[in-house]
Curated annotation (Swiss-Prot):
Lineage: Eukaryota, Viridiplantae, Streptophyta, Embryophyta, Tracheophyta
Compartments it resides in: Plastid, Chloroplast thylakoid membrane
Membrane topology: Multi-pass membrane protein
Listed HAMAP family: NDH1_NuoM (MF_00491)
EC code(s) of this entry: 7.1.1.-
Gene that specifies this protein: ndhD
Protein name as it appears in the record: NAD(P)H-quinone oxidoreductase chain 4, chloroplastic
GO BP term (any one): ATP synthesis coupled electron transport
NCBIfam families, A to Z: NDH_I_M
Record key words, sorted: Chloroplast, Membrane, NAD, NADP, Plastid, Plastoquinone, Quinone, Thylakoid, Translocase, Transmembrane, Transmembrane helix
One annotated GO molecular function: NADH dehydrogenase (ubiquinone) activity
Length: 500
């Protein structure tokens, strides 16, 4: 057990500091904004410092563990810890939340509440990634939903209430399955109920019961991933949410579902996962094609980007279903990669909306002349999204391909079919991304309108865009920086399938 409660501080600090902001005298929106940014930067620095000095990359076991008694009757403790699977997502959360707070500068209405909700969401997300107790994971999972609902319903577009209601119905409804699974798995096979993830990882179940647990967790976790047909809340939510909220949704929220699939379904229920992995592969493959085919038909700019997120999440599902070292490593790398790329695209879509107040692509055109900096950044990040070599998306998708090829679980004809369908999806990706850029920036539609002028990116927006672009290029050039964090943990998880 760790001597100093680093993880408790990292989890509790954002929401505690945010609560303090609600009681401070109202001194104007700028004070609230800079206070929140300072909290996020300080949190990120504390997290980075704690991990640099306490995390050992060659140790697949839980590190920096903390265990404080809470409710003895349920064996419910405040258990926190990190490993190679969670460290990358925690750092991603800190980085994206800090930039999303900076992106939220134009928000002026109820600024204190808005920034408090962002900090509360920050705590919930880090708590989910660092929980070593199944019920604590569920509580953090739910804690993070409330700020998203309020951010969407209070600072969204014209249909924000519809989108917020749809979001909460999907996510809260699926959480019922998560709660049933948590209670069922903790009560089974032991005289005393246990919620400790490390103990549950060594627990065996009857095949039928393990399958039932697996299905319950899959329904709960894949709503957030999201997997078709449970994805329909996502385009509506992205279409109406403020773009700083979209950055948090695309960059972090979707990754929580994928993280849960690895942490719970793969690690706790290996036999059921082995049975259901072909279905995950099939759904992931269909998802890539379906979302890539649906995206070009979306008039709303943010909805088109949302469908591209659904398509890219298909690669993560395939990597998880492959049950191979390259496949799972590729899925983890894609979680980090798409966290940056998705957040960046939504930020640029939002800054474009701030200037022209248009959301439909068929009303845009000719913006490249007026806003060349935004045009350049949007083009570069679109290239990153379509997996251009040298960018993080290319490496992640390539490693997932290797995972399918090297899988011993599937017949050659099945692997060829999966790769062929994935290749079609990869071909469709530049079609909808490049057509989106063409509709926004080329032509003469807006450039011919008299007395219409746009301001290009200011220092804040340019700094934010470059800050997201640098890790995308960095991971694309040197992916081992991320892969080395999780490689030992991946081997430890997969040992349950080949040696367990």
């Amino acid at each position: 057990m760790n001597d100093f409660p680093w993880l408790t501080i990292i989890v509790v600090f954002p929401i505690s500091a945010g609560s303090l902001m609600l009681f401070l005298p109202h001194r104007g929106n700028k004070i609230n904004k800079w206070y929140t940014i300072c909290i996020c930067i300080l949190e990120l620095l504390i997290t980075t410092y704690a991990f640099c000095y306490n995390f050992k990359m060659d140790d697949p076991l839980i590190q920096m563990s903390e265990d404080y008694k809470w409710i003895n009757f349920f064996d419910f403790d405040w258990r926190l810890g990190i490993d190679g699977l969670s460290i990358g997502t925690i750092l991603l959360t800190g980085f994206i939340t800090t930039l999303a707070t900076l992106a939220a500068f134009p928000v002026t209405r109820d600024s204190r509440l808005f920034h408090f909700l962002m900090l509360a969401m920050y705590s919930g997300q880090i708590g989910s990634f660092s929980s070593r107790d199944l019920l604590l994971f569920f509580i953090m999972w739910e804690l993070e939903l409330i700020p998203v609902y309020l951010l969407l319903s209070m600072w969204g577009g014209k249909k924000r209430l519809y989108s917020a209601t749809k979001f909460i119905l999907y996510t809260a409804g699926s959480s019922i399955f998560l709660l049933i699974g948590v209670l069922g798995i903790s009560l089974y096979g032991s005289n005393e109920p246990t919620l400790n993830l490390e103990l549950l990882a060594n627990q065996s179940y009857p095949v039928t019961l393990e399958i039932l647990f697996y299905i319950g967790f899959v329904i709960a976790l894949t709503v957030k991933s999201p997997i078709i047909p449970l994805h329909t809340w996502l385009p509506d939510t992205h279409g109406e949410a403020h773009y700083s909220t979209c950055m948090l949704l695309a960059g972090i929220l979707l990754k929580m579902g994928a993280y849960g699939l690895v942490r719970i379904n793969m690690e706790l229920l290996p036999h059921a996962h082995s049975l259901f992995s072909p279905w995950l592969m099939a759904v992931g493959t269909i998802q890539i094609i379906y979302a890539a085919s649906t995206s070009p038909g979306q008039r709303n700019l943010k909805k088109r980007i949302a469908y591209s997120s659904v398509s890219h999440m298909g690669f993560i599902i395939i990597g998880i279903g492959s049950i191979t070292d390259p496949g799972l490593n590729g899925a983890i790398l894609q979680i980090i990669s798409h966290g940056f790329i998705g957040a960046a695209l939504f930020f640029l879509a939002g800054t474009s909306y701030d200037r022209m107040r248009l959301v439909y692509l068929d009303e845009m055109g000719g913006m490249a002349i007026s806003i060349p900096k935004i045009f350049t950044m949007f083009t570069i990040l679109s290239m990153a999204s379509l997996a251009l070599p040298g960018m993080s998306g290319f490496v992640a998708e390539l490693i997932v391909f290797f995972g399918i090829i090297t899988s011993q679980k599937y017949f050659v004809i099945s692997k060829i079919l999966i790769i062929f369908v994935m290749a079609i999806g990869i071909i469709l990706t530049p079609i909808y991304l490049l057509s989106m850029s063409r509709q926004m920036f080329y032509g003469y539609k807006l450039s011919n309108v008299k007395n219409l002028s746009f301001f290009d990116s200011g220092p804040r927006e340019l700094f934010l865009s470059i800050s997201i672009l640098l890790p995308i290029i960095g991971i694309g050039i040197y992916p081992d920086f991320v892969l080395s964090l999780a490689s030992d943990k991946v081997e430890s998880i997969l040992s349950n399938y080949f040696y367990g």
